[in-house]
Amino acid sequence: MLKVLLAEDDRTMVSLLKTFLSMEGFQVITLAGATSDILEIVRRERPAIVLMDIFLGAENGIDVLRKLRQMPDLSKMKVIMSSGMNLRDECLAAGANDFLLKPYMPDDLLKMLKSNS
């Protein structure tokens, strides 16, 4: 069972994604709203993939990604960034493995998760 960590500030989106991914056989860890300790949670949980929104309330997902890439024990972790704004190039330059433009279809997310696992 592939472990996925969802870092998203929209609680409705977290609920929908958690339900969908759980039904598809993924083990899902969620972070909604409280993101200040995201790196600590990633380190503790060791997900196979992090699906992270760019806008995380007080945090910026791209900044979190850059910090993650500087941590030797987490630098190789697979990270898929997502946003309603097309910031694909910025995310890939910061070290993301992939980018999903919102709104996206569930099948697109599944394909991306499987190709990055």
Pin down the residues of each PLM region.
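C-terminal output helix
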Residues: 104-114
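Acidic, metal-coordinating helix/loop segments flanking the phosphotransfer/catalytic sites
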Residues: 31-49
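Two-component/phosphorelay signaling modules centered on CheY-like receiver
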Residues: 11-30
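Active-site residues of response regulator receiver
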Residues: 53
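Alpha4 helix (beta4-alpha4-beta5 surface) of REC/receiver domains from two-component response regulators
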Residues: 18, 63, 84-101, 111
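Conserved acidic carboxylate
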Residues: 8, 83
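Short amphipathic alpha-helix used as the core "switch/output" element in two-component signaling
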Residues: 62-75
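The feature encodes the CheY-like receiver
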Residues: 57
